[in-house]
Amino acid sequence: MTKKIIALVGRPNVGKSTLFNRLSIRKKAIVHDLPGITRDRKYTDGKIGSFEFLLIDTPGLEENHDSMGARLMEQTTKAILEADLICFMVDGRSGILPNDKLLGSFVRKYNKPAILVVNKCEKAFDFDKEYYKLGFDSMVTISAEHGTGLIDLYDEIITKLPEEESIETNIADPIKGDYLQIVVSGRPNAGKSTFINALINDERLLTGPEAGITRESIEIDWHYKNNHIKLIDTAGLRKKSTITESLEKLSASDAINSIKFANTVILMIDALAPLKQQDLNIASHVVNEGRGIVIVVNKWDLVKESKKEAFQEEFYYQINTHLPQVKGVPVLFISAINKQNIEQVLDSCLKIYKIWNKKIATSKLNEWLNFTTEAHPLPLQKGGRRVRVKYMTQTKTRPPTFKLFSNNPEKITDSYTRYLVNNMRDAFDMPGIPIRFTYVKTKNPYV
């Protein structure tokens, strides 16, 4: 028996994301005074009292007939259809607005169990009987920010969705356990959301020609070739110097934080926008965090056939020149909107993930080390003594990290370390991931 689904619905800035965070067991939504922050359906495991459920945060609904408004309405409508219970939220400070009446009627026409949640009621006298005119048979007053009124909300929820029918205590949580966490990152308007929608074959994420549509990191559970995958769409990352709005700073921070906890990062690049320093900055950040990386050039269908060969030649040159620390990184050319080569991206992610987790036997490591250092020894130091790397062992995976023992580690140059790392990539088939070396001084300096 699966968990019941509760959707939070209402006009912008009534506190849906604040309540989402209050009820969420794990992932948090961005909260800001600016209305309309949420633009995609956002899911989390929720809990109130002993009652556990799947919670959906939705875009704020407005009477808006432009293209963006229609796409936001589509996202919310899908959440309503998916939900077992609707929490229709209004603002207790501003009172009932015309949009509340219109949207209340819109929600009620689906004949789903619903609760009118009057938020921002920090004081008892905030309650207004006018709210009954919205036509909902159940109503509670709460303050999502301060956590008041949640007991009343709990009582109404279990009345609408009896607890014994909603929870299976022995059921495995699909979020927990072994899964591959893939973050899709890149500059604005590279096609990140379109790519994920194409993969899962669902208009799950809001897309459009406007740059910067995605404002929060959105997690989507998915399965591919018997692998449990969590896809994470992130806000587009611009240069720090161009970010002035506080909301964009929050979105950028959310995206950067997602990279920190990723297993593999897909760096999405727009084929119509030449490779920029910001793309390389994002890639370097991924590598510095020790994550696996797959570089994807999107909108390949829009590049003229006569220019593709020269484009690829220059692109590979730039990547190899500026990202030598992940030599051999997979580069794929796709069209997300046409679903061209998109499965190859996932196959590359699975391969990179396997390499990222690679464990090499100590005996094989030292056999390789002896051969490699003898083939290209470090130069003699003053007094005729040679710096030697005598022994190594792997200390961790994710990414592969190695400890090397030397009689004089401070004399080992960066260029020699690059030589060892690149040789190791070839010897053990480890392209496209960061490899980390740390040096330790042996107790006997003459060894």
From Swiss-Prot:
Entry's Gene Ontology BP terms: ribosome biogenesis
Family: Belongs to the TRAFAC class TrmE-Era-EngA-EngB-Septin-like GTPase superfamily. EngA (Der) GTPase family.
Assembly and oligomerization: Associates with the 50S ribosomal subunit.
Organism annotation: Rickettsia akari (strain Hartford)
This protein's name: GTPase Der
InterPro entries noted in UniProt: G_ENGA, GTP-bd, GTPase_Der, KH_dom-like, KH_dom-like_a/b, P-loop_NTPase, Small_GTP-bd
Gene3D superfamilies in the cross-refs: 3.30.300.20, P-loop containing nucleotide triphosphate hydrolases
GO molecular function annotations of the record: GTP binding
NCBIfam families reported for this sequence: GTPase_EngA, small_GTP
CDD domains membership: EngA1, EngA2
All residue ranges annotated as the EngA-type G domain in the record: 4-165, 180-357
Binding-site positions, GTP 2: 186-193, 233-237, 298-301
Function: GTPase that plays an essential role in the late steps of ribosome biogenesis.
UniProt keyword terms in alphabetical order: GTP-binding, Nucleotide-binding, Repeat, Ribosome biogenesis
Domain KH-like: 358-443
Residues the entry annotates as binding GTP 1: 10-17, 57-61, 119-122
HAMAP family the UniProt entry points to: GTPase_Der
Top-level division of the source organism's lineage: Bacteria
